[in-house]
């Protein structure tokens, strides 16, 4: 049984620079007169977006070739971006960008939009335009199944334990570390996979992340984490 120690709902949206509108952005493709919608993804955040070697998905659909890196991108957000591009009559271009710098690229005009689990915050709202939310997710704390924390059901039980906490760099998850009493700030990582690996290797005691991401990213969530 997985313990949902942090039960907080946040929303995810498409994000564009305030200097651009989705219907007004884009450039002409070099191969056709069709306009291009450039969207950046982390491409390492399953099930929302990930990288694979071939375009084959297995459901009759096709993954999208990544413009600035090897491989193809697919996932819920990639499919959603493709539908938006299709509705606008644009060609979709996918860019693979590390999370820690993805919003900076949006600001400098490297691409038109970001769709990679970006959550609304008042601070981000000062710089970026957010679409209507397309997903609500639950933030949880995940620990090793064989750790002393595995049977905890309340955050108050962590008081005085000096629990080492990790999450993704520069995300809205970071402030939730303060919700764990007596938590010790451990190293944060670029990807969710690295966060889970830190818990598996006992470099950290708990990762704070999205519950759905846990189901897809944890090496073996049913057996190893709670």
Locate the predicted segments by residue:
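Extracellular/periplasmic Venus flytrap/periplasmic-binding protein
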Residues: 188-190, 197-203
